[in-house]
From Swiss-Prot:
Location of the LCN-type CS-alpha/beta domain: 1-64
UniProt entry keywords in alphabetical sequence: Disulfide bond, Ion channel impairing toxin, Neurotoxin, Secreted, Toxin, Voltage-gated sodium channel impairing toxin
Identification of the protein by name: Toxin NaTx-4
GO-annotated molecular function: sodium channel inhibitor activity; toxin activity
Length: 66
């Protein structure tokens, strides 16, 4: 599974500043069980996640426009 990492409480995608290779996104992705993480459109994108890992969008969470 792949997708944008998400804050489970707010429903918002995890933000990043440096597009492309990004150590924070890579670490966050690894912590979620993913194989690769990088910054895509200023949000952390992850590959190799398990199907049970929440990614954006989370049903019922609107992110309050963030």
């Amino acid at each position: 599974k792949e997708g944008y990492l998400v804050n489970k409480e707010t429903g918002c995608k995890l933000a990043c500043v440096t597009t492309g290779e990004n150590k924070n996104c890579k670490l966050d992705c690894k912590n979620q069980g993913g194989s690769k993480g990088y910054c895509l459109l200023f949000r952390c994108f992850c590959e190799g996640l398990s199907e049970s890992t929440p990614t954006f969008p989370i049903p019922g969470k609107t992110c309050s426009g963030k």
